[in-house]
């Protein structure tokens, strides 16, 4: 089987995740709240649960679930076990082979098992991405991949079908977060371990001149009436089943 080319450097991701800051995990909390709401709408008790992600233990505690914790590398180690609920927690946007991960999850489901994956979508950090582009064009006369590409919801729903999951549903929620400066935003991104891990990323250190230009462009294009900047965070939710079944499952609008 031919594997897709690797886009992300997971060795760097692991290092950065070891340096995360709890005070910057607010988007995980937003995702947990939404997952909790969705699970509460399902008339079913899940007994065999797996949570995939580097913060799986924290997720299980906040969701009040007795779950197995699994790392989210390209190969997911289910250790031969099967589950009726698998939650992929804020990591699929860093997958080199997201379809492959969904297929692995499908294979680890018992009949009528449920997969829920939540991760950052393509509108995340759109303002910072544009500000980087303006600054690079002005200072460096070119544009490099400073922020990792993230999928658009119109495309991501198809991943569920490609993985062979039944009853595929894709939807999103956007959050606007206010900051005093771009530096505060970047501090949060480091605290989340959501900085650039593209293998072909620029290794050059940002100069003060370059960073000042990024800030200038950000404030010029995306500041509000209070002199603060806005940053978009988009959460994508993918939901699928191991097979068609008549058990009750409340779901968001079908978008795939």
Mark where each language-model region is:
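Conserved alpha-helix/loop element of class I SAM-dependent methyltransferases that forms part
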Residues: 26-47, 58
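Conserved catalytic/acceptor-binding region of the Class I
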Residues: 118-181, 192-204
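Short catalytic micro-motifs in class I SAM-dependent methyltransferases
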Residues: 90-94
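Conserved Class I S-adenosyl-L-methionine
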Residues: 24, 171-243, 247
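Positively charged, low-complexity/disordered segments
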Residues: 245-256
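N-terminal, positively charged/glycine-rich alpha-helical extensions of SAM-dependent methyltransferases
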Residues: 1-33
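A short glycine-rich, Lys/Arg-flanked "PGG" loop and its adjoining helix->strand segment in the class I
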Residues: 99-114
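A short acidic, Gly/Pro-enriched loop at the edge of an enzyme's catalytic core
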Residues: 76-86
């Amino acid at each position: 089987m031919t594997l897709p080319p690797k886009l992300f450097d997971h060795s760097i991701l692991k290092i950065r995740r070891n340096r995360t800051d709890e005070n910057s995990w607010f988007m995980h909390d937003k995702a947990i709240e939404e997952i909790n709401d969705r699970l509460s709408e399902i008339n079913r008790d899940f007994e065999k649960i797996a949570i995939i992600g580097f913060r799986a233990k924290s997720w299980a505690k906040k969701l009040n679930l007795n779950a197995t914790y699994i790392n989210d590398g390209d190969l997911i180690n289910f250790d031969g076990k099967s589950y009726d609920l698998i939650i992929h927690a804020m990591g699929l946007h860093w997958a080199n082979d997201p379809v492959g991960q969904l297929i692995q999850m499908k294979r680890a489901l018992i009949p009528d098992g449920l997969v829920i994956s939540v991760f950052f979508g393509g509108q995340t950090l759109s303002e910072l991405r544009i500000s980087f582009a303006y600054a690079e064009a002005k200072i460096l006369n070119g544009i490099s991949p400073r922020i990792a590409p993230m999928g658009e919801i119109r495309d991501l729903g198809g991943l569920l079908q490609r993985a062979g999951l039944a009853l595929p549903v894709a939807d999103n929620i956007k959050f606007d977060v206010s900051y005093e400066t771009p530096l505060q935003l970047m501090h949060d991104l480091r605290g989340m371990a959501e900085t650039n891990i593209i293998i072909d990323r620029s290794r050059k250190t940002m100069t003060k001149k370059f960073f000042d230009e990024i800030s200038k462009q950000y404030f010029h294009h995306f500041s509000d009436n209070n002199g603060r900047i806005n940053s978009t965070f988009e959460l994508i939710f993918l939901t699928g089943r191991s097979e068609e079944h008549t058990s009750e499952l409340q779901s968001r609008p079908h978008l795939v």
